[in-house]
Amino acid sequence: MINKAILGGTFDPIHNAHINVAYEALERFNLEEVIFIPAGNPPHKINLKKTPAHIRYEMVKLAIEKETRFSISDFEIKSKSLSYTYRTLKHFKEKEPETNWYFITGEDCLSYLEHWKYIDEIFNICNFVIFSREGFKEKEEIIKKKKSILLKYRKEILFMDASILDISSTKIRNRIKEGKEVSFYMPDKVYKFILQNNLYK
């Protein structure tokens, strides 16, 4: 069976930690492909200011262009409706029903995961992978949440430690506003694109 993963996010901007997570997932889950999906209109971030979708899409495209096992999809940003994870996963599962799908997301989603739309169906469609920038060792709240989901949905959440790189898009945007250096946080072409388009000032 072919294994593929979907890595969703606003990618505002994409940075080295996103790339690191994708490479880690490739190896750990024996993936043939990781599909980056820039978010369109996620319901939990609907009131937050975001860089226009086509610009975020272009940054992701530049960041992954040299890796043949990475691809990008505009499925969410082309949609006029809210970007529900279930709808995205359903789309890819219907396209490739025989593929074993993984969905990769950040630890911050754990706090509201059980309130996601059609969460039962999501667990049926894919293997749920959560990564952390801070590591998972001895985190009591993580252990409790994992047990809770296992009992309620009879599904095991997979955890992946991405603590090697303590980077966030928010940190990058703030550093740019403050006039600080950020080139070491992202692929060179993404950094140049940000400069050329005067982003995050």
Curated annotation (Swiss-Prot):
InterPro entries: Cyt_trans-like (IPR004821), NadD/NMNAT (IPR005248), Rossmann-like_a/b/a_fold (IPR014729). Pathway: Cofactor biosynthesis; NAD(+) biosynthesis; deamido-NAD(+) from nicotinate D-ribonucleotide: step 1/1. The keyword Transferase applies. CDD domains: NMNAT. It catalyses: nicotinate beta-D-ribonucleotide + ATP + H(+) = deamido-NAD(+) + diphosphate. HAMAP family: NaMN_adenylyltr. This is Probable nicotinate-nucleotide adenylyltransferase. Belongs to the NadD family.
